[in-house]
Amino acid sequence: LRTGKRMPTKVSEVVIYFKRQPHNLFGDSFKNLPPNKLVIRLQPDEGVEITVMNKVPGLTSSGSMDLQKSKLNLSFSEAFADERIPDAYEKLLLEVMLGNQALFVRRDEIEQAWTWVDSILEAWKQSSEPPEPYQAGTWGPVDSIGLLARENRSWYESKTGKKK
């Protein structure tokens, strides 16, 4: 989970990396294939994208095969180009004007959330290491890259979203 303020783009996405298969169907020459992934874009351009490695149709002259990364992309703004898609706040304001409070949190929920946040703030006060700052307009602290690199992983950096 990565979140922050003043990052390069304003975007909310859920990125799911699928586990690598225990048996490599493509042979030893394709040992380090990137994992397939599913990106669910919540805002600003709602949609779903799945990226998979697949075999290029046909054979090479040597009888080997080639693989390439392919994307299947559903962008609501493209799929419904003739429709006006309301902004998230428009939907929220319409619901409150209609008297539907289902999209809003109650006071007891807010108090419970602050109980959780207060425990985090208290743990930070007890810690000898403060949260690591980062330069505005970047994807976060430099050390966050090393945090994932220790597990041979890397952060997903969104290509969508509104530039700040």
PLM segments and residue spans:
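Secretory/organelle targeting and membrane-embedding segments
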Residues: 1-164
